[in-house]
Amino acid sequence: MENTYKIQKIGKVNAENGIYSIQLDKQFIPGLTNISGFKYLQVVWWGHLYDTPQNRASLIIDKPYKKCPDKLGVFGTRSEIRPNPILITTIQVMQIDMEAGKIYTPYIDAETGTDILDIKPYHMLERIKDCDVPDWCQHWPKWYEEAGDFDWADEFNF
């Protein structure tokens, strides 16, 4: 028996002229009550640009990163190509316009118009002190704050 789920969007991504924001739909704006004080949020979004039957059936990806093995299972990647294109990004909060329901961030790796499914606060307790990763990605930044200066273009094969 197949389970189905009803998911509704709560807002959309805006990325215009180098300004990134999340605009909540009006009925979800009260969900921002007392969220100020969190410097980082986790944003759950739908990878609509890759939501095809073929991509949903892809479980093995051919060398998405230059230094990874020739084949990599989709669950070992953060690729949009996956059985359910549900993606998560941690964003830095620059400003929250509570009245408008708008969250400003320096960057989010989602396109304008991307549906937002959920927003959660990023808590310090989610950090992992002893985090191990495969050798092929050991050289990646260890901290979010270092990732902006990293040459990601030299890592990807797409």
Model-derived features with residue positions:
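Cys-His-centered catalytic/binding microenvironment captured across papain-like cysteine peptidases
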Residues: M1-I88, Q95-F158
